[in-house]
Amino acid sequence: MKALVKREAAKGIWLEEVPVPTPGPNEVLIKLEKTAICGTDLHIYLWDEWSQRTIKPGLTIGHEFVGRVAALGSAVTGYEIGQRVSAEGHIVCGHCRNCRGGRPHLCPNTVGIGVNVNGAFAEYMVMPASNLWPIPDQIPSELAAFFDPYGNAAHCALEFNVIGEDVLITGAGPIGIIAAGICKHIGARNVVVTDVNDFRLKLAADMGATRVVNVANQSLKDVMKELHMEGFDVGLEMSGNPRAFNDMLDCMYHGGKIAMLGIMPKGAGCDWDKIIFKGLTVQGIYGRKMYETWYKMTQLVLSGFPLGKVMTHQLPIDDFQKGFDLMEEGKAGKVVLSWN
């Protein structure tokens, strides 16, 4: 079968022939229909410092997907051949304190598909049946293909009550863009998104952000004055940029709450005085709650949330290089690849 493989310890990704995997007793074989390129895939493609210490060459990458059940392991029940599914890309142990306590998204033994084990950029893949998420007929496959990052955005946006609140989102990558839309969809008052990429800031505005701010040439505090704000009630940090995070701390209202998804560089500093004397709550966010986030994000789409606005490109798998080029240039929202 065809698969996108990190063949060499260098920049690039390679379309290769690899064996079709065989599902174990509790696994399902999935025939992939559509996959989407994540920022993680771009890191692996670029072969940056993180990927060099994390990824073993020879890995099939990818973790955003939708497909159909092609074969069932001998112990699998509850699914049918041909059923359309996506899946939670974090495979958890099931026996640690957090897994047994109903907090599997905090499993310390988590294994990520397309990072630690072979992933979804292939014609077929295997997944534990317990990780599958059935996709309702009303949801198009091109949207279901990126439910994984949509789930990151939903987990972050729903961590704190944003109804009637002023929300600051630092980072207009696809997850930040989707989070802006979710916050407006569920009733936030003002949603302000900051970045330095005008293309992606426009996508955030199209998704419903009240204001978008290119901080390279505009002051966030000036925008706050224009909106008659004293400070932000909720912050969603999506950029992994220390300067953006410190700007957020500076602009938070006393008692505000921050959900952090962006990964800061090691040793990055922050103004702890702002956190302490403003009484801020800072909550780390990783992945999706299993499977409450999946339920809520499915219902959001079924209730009219315009998730499709963040998708900018659909390409056949043979044009995968164009997709990675667009992502590297920052000239895309979500890029979806078709395996049909």
Curated annotation (Swiss-Prot):
Binds 2 Zn(2+) ions per subunit. The keyword Cell wall biogenesis/degradation does not apply. Its cofactor is Zn(2+). GO terms for molecular function: L-threonine 3-dehydrogenase activity; zinc ion binding. One of its GO terms (biological process) is L-threonine catabolic process to glycine. The active site is at T40, H43. Pathway: Amino-acid degradation; L-threonine degradation via oxydo-reductase pathway; glycine from L-threonine: step 1/2. It comes from the Bacteria. Pfam families: ADH_N, ADH_zinc_N. Homotetramer. Catalyzes the NAD(+)-dependent oxidation of L-threonine to 2-amino-3-ketobutyrate. This is L-threonine 3-dehydrogenase. It comes from Stenotrophomonas maltophilia (strain K279a).
